[in-house]
């Protein structure tokens, strides 16, 4: 909460600066951004100048920033709290009854080779999330309600105006991307049909979409955390020593929180800290090849921040559409290596899945 409050204060200061930049005459601005002290920041400052033209009064922008602490950010934190209380009961084969966190349950539901296990977890997963459905619905509605009120205050008639600006793309670009996806989705649909056939089903259930495919005597491999790290470092080194050395240091310095324990939300996450020039990674590692890919993915995020560590802060800000490039590339290094080293067609099919 303290960090969010500090960020709110920073936003208010930045808003004032953006408006002052916008007020500078065009000729003076052209001369200013050519000065050595500002030329390196010309792109970021020019972007701020454009943003300043759509801002409200200082008082109104300050009010929005302060309301965001217990409004937009508050509801987001509320969602995280709700997820931390999710418990998925599951009876193991030996009769032991465990309570899985949302993160543990999701990993097992997607990665367990036994379809009966996946189905049992899915049923309990639906019950657990369904029990809190009204609270989640309220959370999502209030998050979106705050966002729409913000857009209306700034006279953004289309809800995509702000996301497009943030991601630095045009509406035509987004539309073209979706058109390309729609026009080329058939191979993906054919893949899902083929996967269902290989699993002996007419169609895939939700918990089968990401499930492993085990053909013949092949069973999906599992890895300890150390084995996954060793594999990742080895194949990162094939791309370049800087990526490998950085990733090894990140693990040795305990930047990765991957413990398989209760109370954790699903998925992986990486956060960078510009003051210390370090990153921290959050995930739940349960030993699957998918978990190894997630670890590689998050290390890719951390390396992205690392290579920009000496740039001015304003030049290190990028949106999600750029953020996923380094991480996806790092993940692909590992995925390609596992497929390349597969010892049988059955293993290769499992990995390609």
Language-model-detected regions and their locations in the chain:
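A well-structured
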Residues: 1-219
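Active-site recognition of the HExxH zinc-binding catalytic motif
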Residues: 155, 286-307, 327, 332
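Active-site-adjacent bridging/hinge elements
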Residues: 156-161, 204-208, 268-278, 298-309, ...
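Catalytic zinc-binding patch centered on the HExxH motif and its immediate surroundings
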Residues: 218-223, 256-278
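Short pre-active-site segment immediately N-terminal to the catalytic Zn-binding motif
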Residues: 219-227, 238, 274-296
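Conserved helix-loop functional segments at active or binding sites
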Residues: 234, 238-245, 271, 301-312, ...
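Active-site metal-coordination segments of metallo-dependent hydrolases
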Residues: 314-326
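Long, amphipathic alpha-helical stalk/connector segments used for oligomerization, subunit docking
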Residues: 336-353
């Amino acid at each position: 909460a303290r960090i969010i409050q500090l960020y709110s204060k920073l936003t208010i200061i930045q808003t004032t600066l953006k408006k002052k930049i916008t007020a500078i005459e065009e000729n003076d601005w052209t001369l200013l951004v050519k000065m050595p002290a500002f030329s390196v920041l010309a792109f970021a400052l020019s972007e701020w100048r454009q943003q300043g033209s759509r801002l409200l009064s200082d008082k109104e922008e300050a009010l929005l920033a302060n309301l965001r602490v217990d409004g937009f950010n508050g509801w987001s934190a509320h969602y995280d709290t709700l997820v931390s209380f999710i418990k998925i009961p599951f009876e193991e084969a030996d009769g032991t009854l465990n309570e899985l966190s949302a993160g543990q349950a999701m990993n097992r539901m997607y990665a367990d080779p036994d379809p009966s296990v996946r189905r049992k977890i899915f049923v309990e997963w639906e019950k657990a999330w369904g029990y809190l459905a009204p609270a989640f619905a309220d959370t999502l509605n209030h998050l979106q309600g705050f966002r729409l009120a913000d857009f209306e205050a700034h006279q953004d008639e289309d809800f995509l105006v702000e996301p497009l600006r943030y991601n630095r793309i045009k509406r035509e670009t987004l539309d073209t991307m979706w058109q390309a996806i729609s026009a080329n989705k058939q191979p993906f649909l054919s893949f899902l049909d083929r996967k269902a056939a290989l699993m002996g089903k007419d169609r895939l259930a939700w918990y089968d979409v990401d499930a492993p495919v085990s053909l013949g005597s092949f069973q999906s491999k599992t890895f300890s955390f150390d084995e996954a790290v060793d594999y990742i470092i080895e194949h990162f080194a094939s791309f370049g020593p800087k990526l490998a050395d950085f990733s090894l240091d990140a693990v040795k310095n305990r930047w990765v929180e991957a413990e398989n324990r209760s109370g954790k939300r699903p998925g992986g996450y990486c956060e960078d800290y510009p003051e210390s020039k370090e990153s921290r990674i959050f995930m739940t590692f349960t030993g699957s090849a998918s978990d190894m890919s997630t670890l590689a993915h998050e290390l890719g995020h951390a390396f992205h921040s690392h290579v920009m560590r000496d740039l001015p802060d304003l030049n290190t800000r990028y949106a999600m559409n750029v953020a996923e490039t380094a991480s996806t590339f790092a993940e692909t290094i590992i995925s390609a290596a596992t497929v390349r080293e597969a010892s049988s067609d059955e293993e290769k099919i499992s990995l390609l899945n």
